[in-house]
Amino acid sequence: MADSDKDELAEIAGFGYERARDELVNVVKMLEQGGMDLDESLALWERGEALANRCEEHLAGARKRVEDALAGSESDES
């Protein structure tokens, strides 16, 4: 993996959910428009995959927080 790829992944790892989602939407739009050569398209697709993974991480964390809160509520009621 090239240093620029590592830098990009490190940058994406710091994104909040909304920023990652918004950038992912833009990546999808650009890919749908076409007009890029194969290398550009692949690089953009790889960025989209990293952004999608970041969104999934945020959603998994949110899901866990909700489950934990619900479990705490249920134990308080017992």
Swiss-Prot record:
InterPro entries, sorted: Exonuc_VII_S, Exonuc_VII_ssu_sf
Broad class of where this protein is predominantly found: cytoplasm
Keyword RNA-binding: no
UniProt GO molecular function: exodeoxyribonuclease VII activity
Record function comment: Bidirectionally degrades single-stranded DNA into large acid-insoluble oligonucleotides, which are then degraded further into small acid-soluble oligonucleotides.
Subunit structure: Heterooligomer composed of large and small subunits.
NCBIfam families: PRK00977.1-3 (NF002139), xseB (TIGR01280)
Protein name: Exodeoxyribonuclease 7 small subunit
